Structure formats: C-alpha cells, structure tokens
Amino acid sequence: MSAQASVAEVKRDKPWIIRTYAGHSTAAESNKLYRGNLAKGQTGLSVAFDLPTQTGYDPDHELARGEVGKVGVSIAHLGDMRALFDQIPLAQMNTSMTINATAPWLLSLYLAVAEEQGAPLAALQGTTQNDIIKEYLSRGTYVFPPAPSLRLTKDVILFTTKNVPKWNPMNVCSYHLQEAGATPVQELSYALAIAIAVLDTVRDDPDFDEASFSDVFSRISFFVNAGMRFVTEICKMRAFAELWDEIAQERYGITDAKKRIFRYGVQVNSLGLTEQQPENNVHRILIEMLAVTLSKRARARAVQLPAWNEALGLPRPWDQQWSMRMQQILAFETDLLEYDDIFDGSTVIEARVEALKEQTRAELTRIAEIGGAVTAVEAGELKRALVESNARRISAIEKGEQIVVGVNKWQQGEPSPLTAGDGAIFTVSETVEMEAETRIREWRSKRDERAVGQALADLEQAARSGANIMPPSIAAAKAGVTTGEWGQRLREVFGEYRAPTGVTLQTVTSGAAEDARLLIADLGERLGETPRLVVGKPGLDGHSNGAEQIALRARDVGFDVTYDGIRQTPTEIVAKAKERGAHVIGLSVLSGSHVPLVREVKAKLREAGLDHVPVVVGGIISTEDELVLKNMGVTAVYTPKDYELDKIMVGLAKVVERALDKRAADRADTEAGVPGAPKRNESGAQVF
C-alpha cells in the first residue's frame, strides 16, 4: 500500500455484527428499544426474554410471580411476538434469541411472524441459543430431562438445516460456563464436549440424511466469554478455532475448509463487573473486547457488550448506547480491520495455544471415558468441578491473591458521578405483571379453542411419537397456543428435571473463617443442636452460583445446610424451613424480583407461625430496595460488594444469635406477664 494512499482506499475487513442484548417489560416497549438501537448503528438484534418465557410459563402462573418482564421481554403468544418485531423487517435482520428449553417454541413464533411479513424462510438469518446442556451446569433455565431436551435441540437443527438454511440452530455457550467459574480449559473442553454430544445425536438419528451432515456442522456456532486475562483469552479463542477444525476433520470427516470454520459470537465477562467503583467496569469491558477482536484468525462474528452498571441492576438505554459506541469506535476509528492476524508468528502465543489444546484434549478424553457430556452432567461431575473452580476464584479474591481494583485493592476513591441522581439503573414497574396477566386472559378469550385443542393434541402426538417437534409447534403458534400451554403439554410428556447442585465438595476458605466457626459452635451448645440454614432460590432465577457458594461456605464453617437448587415457590421454601427447623433462611434472587418474592416468603412464614425465623437476602439489590426489604422484616441484605464469604458467615451466625436472644427475652417477658409480650398457645409454644 502506498504511503500516500488515502484512508478511503485502504482495504478493510468487514466488521463484526454489533449487537446489544436487550428486552424488558412488554413486547411494545422492547420494540421501541430495538428500533432505537438500530437507528443508533446497531447491526443485529439480540433478544433477552424474561424467565417465564424461558421456562415455559404464562405470566399468570404461580412461578411467574414477580418475574414477568424483569430480565427480558415477556412473550406469551403470537400476538406478543408480532408486537416485538413490528416495523422491523425480519428478512433483512440478523436476530439472536437467547432461548434454550423453549427454543423450538420461540423459533416457531418467530417463523410465524416472518411468514406474516412475507419473508421467505430461506432468507431468514439469526441464531437460537438452544444449548440446553449448559443450562444444567450454569444458567438454570432447563425444563425437561437431558434426553428429551437433547431431542428437542436435534429437532430444531434438523428443521432449520432443511427449511431455514441461513439460521444458526444452536449456539454452544461457553459464555455461561465462565460465568459459573470455569477455567479456560474447562470452558474449552466442556463446550466442545457439548457440541460433540449434540452432533453425535444428530448424526445417529435414523431419519437423518448423512449427505447433509457437513451443512449441519457448518451451522453450529458458539457463544463465548472473554475475561480480564486477555492474552490467555486470545490464546483460548485461537485454541477453540484450531480444536474445532481438528474435530471436524478427525471425528466427522468434514473436508470442506469453509464448513470447518469456527464461528462465534461473544458477550464479554459480566461476572467480573463490580458494584464498587462501577466506573472501572468501562475499562474492563473494553479490555475484554480486545481479546475477541484483535486476532483476525479467531475474531468474533458478532459482539455484544454488557453495560458498566450491570452489577447494580438493569442498564438504561444510554448505558447500552455507551457499550455500543465502544464497538463502533474500535471497528471504525482504528486500523484494526486493515491487517492480517497480528499475532501470527508469536512464539509466546503459539506456546500458550498449544498448552491449552493439549490440556483440553486430555479433559475431553476424561469426559468421553465418563460417557460423554450428557452422562457427565447427569452424574453431577461437571457441575461439581465448576462449583469448585468458582470457590477457588472467590477465595483468591478474598485473600487478595487475585486483585480486583476498587474491591480488594485501592478501595478509597472519589464518589462516582455516574451513580448520582436516579440510581443509575432501569427499573421495571410491578404493574407490568398485572398488565401481562390481563392481556393473556384477553388473548385466550378471543381465540378458537377448538383449533387450540387440536394443535395441542398434535403437539403431544409428535412429542410421544418422536416426530420433529417444529411443524406442530409452528401450527400451535398460528392457532393461538400460549407459551405456558406449549410448555405444560411437553411437561406432561417428558416430565421435569432437577439438576445436581454441585454442593458436595469441600470448598476453599480464605483462612478467616475461624471466627464464624467459633460463633457457630457456641450457638450449637446453646441450641443443643447444629444451627440450621435453609438456602432458597425463589422464583425462576436460575443463576445459582451465589447460592451454591454460600451453601458451600456455610457448611464448611459448621452450619447444617439445606439447599435444594433453583426454582422454588415461596410455599416450598417455607415448608422446607418448617421441616428442617431452620434457624435462618437465606434467599438468593438475581433476577430483580426480590421485592415481590421476599414479600410472599415473609407472608407465608407468618401464616406458618415461623415469622420468628430470620430471613437474609442476597442479590443485585439497589439501596432503595434494600430499605424496602428491611421494612418488610428482612434482617440483612447482601449485594455483589459483599464478596468476603467468611464475613457473611459471621453475619449469619450473629443473625441467629440475635434471634435467639430476642426469643429468650420474649419468653422471659411472657413468663413475667409483661404487657404486650408474646402469648402462649394451648401447647405452650410461643405465638409470634
């Protein structure tokens, strides 16, 4: 290139697809958000669905209470999907949908809307995440057992390969594995093992046309994570690409080099975003993006960045715009896209890549010896390993071995102007849920019930017979079937599943746990039994990492811990507390639904005569909501800033101690006949 060449004459690679993960409240509100983001330069859509939609419930179901429209948009039927993409031509759009257990259903709704718009299915471009195996390990929005879930994944792949050839039917998601604590080798090996399990399932289907296998392979994409150790992350991505090519040739005999290309999208790490000094998160996000864009041979095809304030709550449109501008500045203002891979020939990079590949091959062999990814998941083997890795990560931060600026080092600083004023987050009104309940009742009242009944019968027949689930799902979408009805009919056929919690291994403590152990031992002597902690995950929030680590550490400092995993109703949590004789209840809610869910738990405790049992709550909780919770009677609130687990254990022990002191004082007042003291019932037990 001539030194005199103008910038306009320089040949540049095409930039990656620029996305923002977005969706909240209603389809109409999310539609406004999408059209606004597209006008700002976004080049693809990434749809966030709320938890009822992701787990196959209608907005008026008991388990949907408090969750409607919180972490994404509520889509209960075809009318909602129609409104979501109003004035957005799907034939021209590249749409990514973060949906897994209900992926066949949401894709069916999308295809029905595309048909209404007159878009040919062959023209549609986009992705359904559809990686159900990782849901058992990290994200928690699974519904059915692994075998039928894998069958549904296969059905989507076979249908789209034939009918929607530009669609990516599955995103193998190592992203969520890193969020659950995975090391680079675990992220590589678990994701590749999942891909192998799915591809083997497709290949072994008796009705599958082997001649089209290379087409299936070429449409499997990945959704990865990138953390702060960005040199290692660059090497991880290069290792991913090389191992994928290796698997394509050696395991599946793919000869077409283009079909062996490792194609992936990315959202950089959210786990490392901090509540303390949240302005530092901007730098973290930008550094992490470099890991998936600098190396041309392993560059992301699509990028979506979290917002700086996601450790505080839901981002506002301005926050998402800021993250989008980071991508645009890197892609269009720098010369990054003018060069071939700038890391080729680096002996440091090559050595690290080879080491990662060797370790990953060894782990893949170990998983294969267990019986493959599905067997390893069902046995709890992979979940236990992730929980242990996450425990080591947390312990390293607690000890100061892993520095996190503003958290365990250089905590003192000036107040951030970014968090002044309105609290720096977006909040979803509680009226959204009531409005959604009204809308779905209206939808049910206006449809043809005979057509709905026939569509559900056809869906059930396909599920039981092994026929592809997509055609009857599309027909059901057009007939007016709801998300909850689709989910319930398949629950009746396949059953529901409870994944292993992984809370079985000895955790790694920071060495500062002795105070907690002594306090708990003293409490045990006073009680005449081991203090009992019930950890609950009310609602549909499947992000269990925090609850798992609390359960691990509490057990290790001496609590008798009960943790039954995700997706519990307030009634179930209170029943478990009564059964176990809990001395303290810990609730973990990361979906923003803490206020209504905790309110209901407290009400159920009062009904059960257990209002004396203290409740503590952990989650992404604003200062305003913390006050609301404490006014409800919550004893303590923990947020991401409370990263020292041993201090939380001391706090839990003191919560039990204060509750015992209060009960002793109340008992003494009752015996003394003090006016206003708690009364005894006929059995002699105190009534609170």
Swiss-Prot record:
Keyword Metal-binding among record annotations: yes
Broad enzyme group: isomerase
Cofactor: adenosylcob(III)alamin
Boundaries of every B12-binding domain copy: 530-659
Region of interest called Disordered, as start-end residue ranges on this chain: 666-688
Annotated residues for binding of adenosylcob(III)alamin: 543
Keyword terms, alphabetized: Cobalamin, Cobalt, Isomerase, Metal-binding
Reported induction: Up-regulated during growth on ethylamine.
Mutant lacking the gene: phenotype: Cells lacking this gene lose the ability to grow on C1 (methanol and methylamine) and C2 (ethanol and ethylamine) compounds, and also on beta-hydroxybutyrate, but they grow normally on pyruvate. Growth on C1 and C2 compounds is restored by addition of glyoxylate or glycolate, indicating that these mutants are unable to convert acetyl-CoA into glyoxylate.
Keyword Oxidoreductase: no
EC id: 5.4.99.63
Annotated CDD domains: MM_CoA_mut_B12_BD
Reaction catalysis annotation: (2R)-ethylmalonyl-CoA = (2S)-methylsuccinyl-CoA
GO molecular function terms attached to this record: cobalamin binding; metal ion binding; methylmalonyl-CoA mutase activity
Family: Belongs to the methylmalonyl-CoA mutase family.
NCBIfam families reported for this sequence: acid_CoA_mut_C, acid_CoA_mut_N
Protein name as catalogued: Ethylmalonyl-CoA mutase
Native species: Methylorubrum extorquens (strain ATCC 14718 / DSM 1338 / JCM 2805 / NCIMB 9133 / AM1)
Lineage: Bacteria, Pseudomonadati, Pseudomonadota, Alphaproteobacteria, Hyphomicrobiales
Gene name linked to the record: ecm
